[in-house]
Structure formats: structure tokens, C-alpha cells
Amino acid sequence: MGYRKLGRTSDQRKAMLRDLATSLIVSERIETTEARAKEVRSVVEKLITLGKKGDLASRRNAAKTLRNVEILNEDETTQTALQKLFGEIAERYTERQGGYTRILKVGPRRGDGAESVIIELVD
């Protein structure tokens, strides 16, 4: 299976996909271009599958990709993106066998006309 270069070098592309994947795990919904959304979808699907496995090796593999971002919950406690992935998100998708994300087209971006989409986690 091929991949999109997204007009960047390999290290820039990897960093951008890590950032987008972490943002999607934290926010559960982000707006980006269609090409980026299609690329980050495969990264996030694999991360959620690792989260469902839940063993130590899966946690370490997911930690390689996700940024170490702290999330403030409503009850004033903090958790990292990795904890949210292996706790809340993995529990939500125990019965689902893939297809954890949805891409909704928004229309062209005003500045350059790039096709904007919203990528979100399916409930």
C-alpha cells in the first residue's frame, strides 16, 4: 500500500501525522485537508487497534507515535493522550472491528481552495 508524500520530507511528514493523530485522540474531532485526513485515518485506526489489545507491547508501540500531551478533565484531573487511548477510547470500540473514524467534507478552504474535511471518531 502506498502513501501520500503531502509535499514534505519524511521526517516532517512523520511529525505532522503524529501531531494530527494526537490531536484527534485528544479532541476526537479535527478539521484539516482531505489528503491529510486520509493519511491520519490509517495511523489512528492502527493506534485504536493497539489500544484495544491493551498489553504492554501495544502500549509501548502506541507511545512511539503519540505525543505526551496532558488533558485536563472536567473533574480537574489530568490524563495523557496515551491514557485516554487505552482507557476511554479502547473501551468505546471493544465491539467494533475497524472503521473508528469518519471523514465529512466541509468544502474548499478560503485561502487556497484546498478541500477541507472534518475527521472525527465514530461514537
Swiss-Prot record:
Keywords: Ribonucleoprotein, Ribosomal protein. Coiled coil: none annotated. Pfam families: Ribosomal_L17. GO terms for biological process: translation. The keyword Ribonucleoprotein applies. PROSITE patterns: RIBOSOMAL_L17. SUPFAM superfamilies: Prokaryotic ribosomal protein L17 (SSF64263). One of its GO terms (molecular function) is structural constituent of ribosome. One of its GO terms (cellular component) is cytosolic large ribosomal subunit. Part of the 50S ribosomal subunit. Contacts protein L32. PANTHER family: LARGE RIBOSOMAL SUBUNIT PROTEIN BL17M, RIBOSOMAL PROTEIN L17. Belongs to the bacterial ribosomal protein bL17 family. This is Large ribosomal subunit protein bL17. It comes from Staphylococcus haemolyticus (strain JCSC1435). The gene is rplQ.
